[in-house]
Amino acid sequence: MGAIAVLFIVFGFPIVAGVFGIAGHFLFKRFWVAPLIVLITSLILLVTLASGNSSFIFWVVMYTAIALVTSVATLFLRKFFE
């Protein structure tokens, strides 16, 4: 795996998961929909791109957690400022 791929896994995907958590909350009006989509997408990518390597399950959990945290934070901030 190249250096660019590692940087994208460590920095790129978490940023995308966070942005998707925020956008998903505004689009779907539920805090759990975006993390669920991130989880399903990450699992599909784990099986297809990483050939089912179970060591990448850590990243699947991290991306889902990041999406969940940003979605819940957006929920609380939205209620706080309304």
From Swiss-Prot:
InterPro entries with a match to the protein in the record: Uncharacterised_YbeF
Gene Ontology CC entries for this record: plasma membrane
The organism's place on the tree of life at top rank: Bacteria
UniProt keyword annotation of NADP present: no
Transmembrane segments: 4-26, 31-50, 55-77
Keywords from the UniProt entry: Cell membrane, Membrane, Transmembrane, Transmembrane helix
Membrane protein topology class: Multi-pass membrane protein
Intracellular or extracellular location(s): Cell membrane
Annotated protein name in UniProt: Uncharacterized protein YycQ
Organism: Bacillus subtilis (strain 168)
Gene label: yycQ
